[in-house]
């Protein structure tokens, strides 16, 4: 204020001022804008200027909490979840009708692959019987590798649309996602999609749902998400069937109906209780958090505290996804929206998924929410920058992506061959592949990725157990090996669905991959559900690709963790002139050693440049050589200037050359370029 008064006095006195005072004018005026800017930014971090309230915000404010509905769409891959989401957004006026295609699939990799990778949210307003309802839709992934996304989405929902393709019927991930939703107590509404296809058999699909899930199919809705047929019947069904309750599973409400009268999805009058559901990084705003408000309300300028870290933040902005970030003045109990802090979170690790936030001063009055179960990474790869100078850029890129996907584990490691890098853990091979694509597309990272491997459990003779995720930590020397009681590998229970005509080929494939059959049943006259217990190591070795090839693309696969079983596990290494190449080493079952060893030496030979001496490439387990290839040296013609008849001189020169090559091989280092590793490790 004092600066403003001084500026005003100077301006009023300026006409009478001397030339000297005029020369000072640029200094005062130049600093004035900087003063106002800094003051405004300082004030903005604590409070916000009053903004005109939009019509959308007025409509939301007028909707009581009893007319909130949170629901998601559950289905197998490619059964039409994202397309149905588009039609619902058009129906509610959230987006304009027209050429909308997977509006909620926002990542480039999702649009390229045609699958949903991240669960995306959107708020909608729908008028039913003359009353507005606030609907919160979650479009979930269908693939098993993104199960963590699905389970987090269910936590903020009261019900789900169980979507089945009328032409394909129930598939493996339909079954898996149904049981996941059922365990969470969600109210399930059967929906048959793609009824406009010539091959559609909606009655057969309904019969499958009734027999497999014991669902009441009388209220099932037959739709075509592509054409919009009957989509208008879905939202009234959602409003009438899905409850507006969030603290207790639906089955408890059914057992105790009085509970529903006293336990709505939240209370605006209570202190703030806010759950962090997801987070992502914005280059301008920093870390943005997707939150579910259970109690109270949150506004920009308020100070909140994290129960997990104890750190305090000022809220910079709140809003809803409609379908993009749409600022609001307040988020109330029962709503799902986004917030970001000003100043923002300094480290990505501060945004802990499942964390509870409340207003500063109310920590003792609020009970934190239980949060989410941490998923376990079961597929591991090593990632290295192609150029060692880009390590910091790769680290920043990985941290930003991990902010958006907390099921990934990150650990620094180094390799003599490839330098500094990271050991990354994923939920599956598709999860790994999508992460690699996002690193390249969104951050321009040039990386070398090793083939996927699975963890092993070492049980020592003294009773201790240790999980090994890196080949570098595997006990291979005789002294350590003598202290090991047994080595175990993880198994999974795989559920495969496919037409009956491919049964023989699928069983043959499973047996060839060390599988053990658990059950076989027909859920229709032509469709089979086959359950096999398989080693996870076999599953990540392109098992799904082989399954698709055996069934002409008609099979589907889902799996869940089973148990650890004892196996003959060894460390396979690649040796170049007897020196191990640490970046390539893998932990494998003994049955895979010979096949992999021969593949390695043959492929690696193609990418190693010839030297002045012989280069020997070997695959080895311990001291046993499994396979070998040799790169012949450049040949120098030492006999070029020699007379043809001088036999003794000829022999002497050849012996000297031979001895020289031996010395070179003994002391010479084989120079292997990064591009050779990149080509070797490429699929």
UniProtKB/Swiss-Prot annotation:
Listed InterPro entries: EF-4, EFG_III/V, EFG_V-like, EFTu-like_2, G_TR_CS, LepA_C_sf, LepA_CTD, LepA_IV
One BP term from GO: translation
Main location: mitochondrion
One protein family per Pfam: LepA_C
Top-level taxon in the UniProt lineage: Eukaryota
Membrane topology value: Peripheral membrane protein
The EC number(s) this enzyme carries: 3.6.5.-
A molecular-function term among this protein's GO annotations: mitochondrial ribosome binding
Enzyme class of the recorded protein, top EC level: hydrolase
Span of domain tr-type G: 66-250
PANTHER family attached to this UniProt entry: TRANSLATION FACTOR GUF1, MITOCHONDRIAL, TRANSLATION FACTOR GUF1-RELATED
Function recorded in the entry: Promotes mitochondrial protein synthesis. May act as a fidelity factor of the translation reaction, by catalyzing a one-codon backward translocation of tRNAs on improperly translocated ribosomes. Binds to mitochondrial ribosomes in a GTP-dependent manner.
Record-linked NCBIfam families: lepA, small_GTP
Protein name: Translation factor guf1, mitochondrial
Organism listed in the record: Neosartorya fischeri (strain ATCC 1020 / DSM 3700 / CBS 544.65 / FGSC A1164 / JCM 1740 / NRRL 181 / WB 181)
Gene coding for it: guf1
């Amino acid at each position: 204020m004092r600066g403003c008064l001084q500026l005003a006095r100077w301006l009023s006195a300026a006409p009478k001022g001397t030339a000297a005072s005029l020369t000072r004018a640029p200094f005062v005026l130049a600093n004035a804008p900087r003063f106002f800017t800094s003051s405004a930014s300082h004030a903005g971090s604590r409070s916000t200027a009053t903004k005109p309230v939009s019509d959308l915000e007025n409509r939301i404010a007028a909707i009581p909490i009893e007319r909130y509905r949170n629901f998601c769409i559950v289905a197998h891959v490619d059964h039409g979840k994202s397309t149905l989401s588009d039609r619902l957004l058009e129906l509610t006026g959230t987006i304009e009708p027209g050429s909308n295609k997977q509006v909620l699939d926002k990542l480039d990799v999702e649009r390229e692959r045609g699958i949903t990778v991240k669960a995306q949210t959107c708020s909608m307003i729908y008028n039913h019987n003359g009353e507005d309802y606030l609907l919160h839709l979650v479009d979930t992934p269908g693939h098993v590798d993104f199960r963590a996304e699905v389970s987090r989405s269910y936590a903020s929902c009261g019900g789900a649309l169980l979507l089945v393709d009328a032409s394909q019927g129930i598939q493996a991930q339909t079954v898996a996602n149904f049981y996941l939703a059922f365990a969470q107590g969600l109210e399930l509404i059967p929906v048959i999609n793609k009824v406009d296809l010539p091959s559609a058999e909606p009655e057969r699909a309904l019969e499958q749902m009734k027999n497999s899930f014991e669902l009441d199919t009388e209220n099932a809705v037959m739709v075509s998400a592509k054409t919009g047929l009957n989509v208008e019947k879905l939202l009234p069904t959602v409003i009438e069937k899905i409850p507006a309750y969030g603290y207790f599973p639906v089955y408890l409400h059914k057992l105790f109906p009085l509970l529903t009268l006293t336990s709505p999805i939240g209370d605006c009058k209570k202190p703030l209780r806010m759950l962090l559901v997801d987070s992502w990084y914005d280059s301008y705003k920093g870390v943005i958090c997707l939150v579910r408000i259970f109690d109270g309300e949150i506004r920009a300028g308020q100070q909140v505290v994290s129960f997990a870290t104890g750190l305090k933040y000022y809220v910079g902005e709140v809003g809803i996804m409609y379908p993009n970030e749409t600022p609001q003045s307040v988020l109330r109990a029962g709503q799902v929206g986004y917030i970001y802090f000003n100043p923002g979170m300094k480290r990505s690790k501060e945004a802990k998924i499942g964390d509870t936030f409340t207003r500063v001063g109310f920590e003792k009055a609020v009970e934190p929410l239980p949060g989410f179960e941490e998923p376990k990474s079961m597929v591991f790869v090593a990632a290295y920058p192609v150029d060692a100078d880009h390590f910091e850029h790769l680290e920043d890129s990985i941290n930003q992506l991990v902010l958006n996907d907390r099921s990934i584990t990150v650990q620094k490691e180094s390799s003599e061959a490839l330098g500094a890098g990271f050991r990354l853990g994923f939920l599956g091979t598709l999860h790994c592949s999508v992460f690699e694509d996002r690193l390249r597309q969104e951050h321009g990272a040039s990386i070398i990725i090793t083939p996927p491997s699975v963890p092993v459990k070492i049980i020592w003779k003294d009773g201790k157990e240790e999980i090994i995720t890196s080949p570098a930590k595997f006990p291979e020397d005789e002294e350590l090996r003598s202290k090991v009681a047994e080595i175990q590998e993880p198994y999974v229970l795989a559920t495969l669905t496919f037409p009956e005509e491919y049964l023989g080929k699928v069983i043959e494939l499973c047996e060839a991959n060390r599988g053990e059959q658990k059950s076989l049943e027909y859920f229709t006259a032509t469709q089979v559900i086959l359950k096999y217990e398989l080693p996870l190591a076999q599953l990540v070795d392109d098992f799904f690709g082989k399954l698709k090839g055996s069934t002409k693309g008609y099979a589907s696969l889902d799996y869940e963790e089973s148990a650890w079983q004892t196996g003959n596990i060894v460390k396979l290494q690649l040796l170049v002139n007897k020196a191990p190449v640490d970046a390539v080493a893998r932990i494998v079952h003994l049955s895979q050693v010979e096949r992999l060893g021969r593949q390695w030496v043959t492929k690696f030979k193609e990418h190693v440049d010839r030297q002045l001496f012989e280069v020997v490439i070997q695959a080895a387990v311990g001291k046993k050589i499994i396979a070998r290839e040799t790169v012949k040296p450049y040949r120098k013609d030492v006999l070029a200037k020699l007379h043809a008849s001088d036999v003794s001189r000829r022999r002497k020169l050849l012996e000297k050359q031979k001895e020289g090559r031996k010395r070179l091989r003994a002391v010479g280092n084989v120079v292997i370029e990064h591009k050779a590793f990149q080509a070797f490790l490429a699929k």
